[in-house]
Amino acid sequence: MRLLVVEDEKSIAEAIQALLADKGYSVDLAFDGDDGLEYILTGLYDLVLLDIMLPKRSGLSVLKRVREAGLETPIIFLTAKSQTYDKVNGLDLGADDYITKPFEADELLARIRLRTRQSSLIRANQLRLGNIRLNTDSHELESKESSVKLSNKEFLLMEVFMRNAKQIIPKNQLISKVWGPSDNSEYNQLEVFISFLRKKLRFLKADIEIITTKGFGYSLEERT
């Protein structure tokens, strides 16, 4: 499991890194808000420990930008500030937890286990690319602002795209997975349902799109 610690006091950051590494976590460090934001937006981390008082960009600003980007990476504020206002402000912006320094190592580890466990349960029924999630339980396509219900075939088609993101999928393979053994008439149906999905992605203001590779198939790609 890969974690990120964003903390400007190098000695504290390295002590946390050593503690977590001893428990089997892979831990990266960032020492200011700009670097922390850049690291988080890669989407590589299972959880982030984020200080509020940081050079260049505050932890609150980092959190706000992360949530605006649609990332739901668990974030625990780790800060010397204990005022109720700071805690409430952070939680309202989308923080998952808040620990005040100095802290007990066992409490920090317990909170990390709790938040990563909860996140894993959420991810188990979601497929994600860019700012879009596909809920495999409700068959809804979701963005931060809205959601749309998919028909059965729309869902099956979108699930194939999400599970094979950024790969060109031949038309006959898509038809086989969604319609089963097919004849040529289903190629027209495929194009119709691709059109439906494209409209729904536009409605959700998605930063992903279904790309046509002429004469071969389709792929789900992030916009550049």
Swiss-Prot record:
The modification 4-aspartylphosphate is found at residue 51. Residues 124-222 bind DNA. SUPFAM superfamilies: CheY-like. This is Transcriptional regulatory protein DltR. Residues 2-116 form the Response regulatory domain. One of its GO terms (cellular component) is cytosol. It holds the Pfam family Trans_reg_C. Gene3D superfamilies: 3.40.50.2300, 6.10.250.690, Winged helix-like DNA-binding domain superfamily/Winged helix DNA-binding domain. It comes from Streptococcus agalactiae serotype V (strain ATCC BAA-611 / 2603 V/R). It is found in: Cytoplasm. CDD domains: REC_OmpR_DrrD-like, trans_reg_C. PANTHER family: REGULATOR OF RPOS. One of its GO terms (molecular function) is transcription cis-regulatory region binding. The lineage of its organism: Bacteria, Bacillati, Bacillota, Bacilli, Lactobacillales. SMART domains: REC, Trans_reg_C. Member of the two-component regulatory system DltS/DltR. Regulates the expression of the dlt operon. Phosphorylated by DltS. One of its GO terms (biological process) is regulation of DNA-templated transcription. InterPro entries: CheY-like_superfamily, OmpR/PhoB-type_DNA-bd, Sig_transdc_resp-reg_receiver, WalR-like, WH-like_DNA-bd_sf. Keywords: Cytoplasm, DNA-binding, Phosphoprotein, Transcription, Transcription regulation, Two-component regulatory system.
